[in-house]
């Protein structure tokens, strides 16, 4: 088992954005058995989400800060189950990878925020922690370095959905992972118009000792969502209005 895991990690690294990777992943997905489960996301978020949506086919996700199409993705496991959706990332090179291996999806190179003012997008050397948050960039500077700074004009999540969400399409899942700017992305959505069933959102500041004082929790509680789970650093919410 350990030997297989080592080979799989090397395969992920070598072919992470390829059609071959997608094909092999589908085969392995079909061969999953009890006690051996494949995860693609960074902290196993996709296993939590798959468990919630178990048996649901042809769902729809919106993935903000999508990063890579396979490795580290919260939504690739759902894609293999027949889902489709909208992927958004500020790195055009990463979005090109989505175009290659996730043909059913709509994949966009955009920055999402609650402000339309021009921002600097800091692209990390390993592509994993790119951000527009100067505070996050400063917080992680001892562990990651940034290779490029790109000037971009953000759009709100509502604008993205107005333009690209298929007509009458229900959003089953909204996942947000944008390295320190997650709250701003969240509040840029019009929840009266677009109401995801489940929300997975990253928050490095969350504490069980101060749930009601947490900005993300307070915002979603006010919009009739309930906190369903927490797996560092991600919060999982479900709407009460279904």
Feature locations, PLM:
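Phosphate/nucleotide-binding beta-alpha loop and adjacent structural elements of enzyme active sites
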Residues: 2-242
């Amino acid at each position: 088992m350990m030997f297989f895991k080592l080979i799989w990690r090397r395969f992920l690294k070598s072919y992470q954005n390829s059609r071959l990777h997608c094909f092999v992943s589908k085969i392995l997905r079909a061969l999953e058995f009890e006690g051996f489960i494949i995860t693609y996301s960074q902290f196993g978020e996709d296993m939590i989400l798959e468990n919630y949506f178990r048996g649901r086919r042809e769902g729809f996700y919106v993935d903000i800060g999508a990063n890579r199409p396979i490795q580290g993705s919260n939504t690739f496991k759902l894609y293999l189950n027949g889902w489709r959706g909208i992927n958004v990332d500020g790195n055009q090179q990463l979005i090109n990878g989505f175009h290659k291996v996730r043909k059913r999806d709509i994949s966009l190179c955009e920055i999402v925020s609650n402000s339309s003012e021009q921002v600097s997008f800091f692209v990390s050397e390993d592509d994993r922690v790119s951000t527009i948050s100067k505070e996050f960039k400063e917080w992680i500077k001892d562990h990651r370095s940034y290779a490029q700074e790109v000037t971009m004009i953000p759009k709100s999540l509502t604008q993205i959905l107005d333009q690209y969400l298929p007509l009458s399409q229900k959003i089953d899942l909204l996942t947000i992972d944008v390295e320190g700017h997650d709250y701003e992305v969240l509040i840029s959505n019009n929840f009266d118009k677009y109401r995801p069933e489940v929300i997975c959102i990253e928050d490095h500041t969350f504490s069980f000792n101060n749930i009601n004082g947490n900005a993300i929790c307070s915002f979603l509680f006010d919009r009739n969502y309930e906190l369903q789970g927490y797996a560092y650093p991600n919060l999982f919410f479900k709407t009460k209005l279904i």
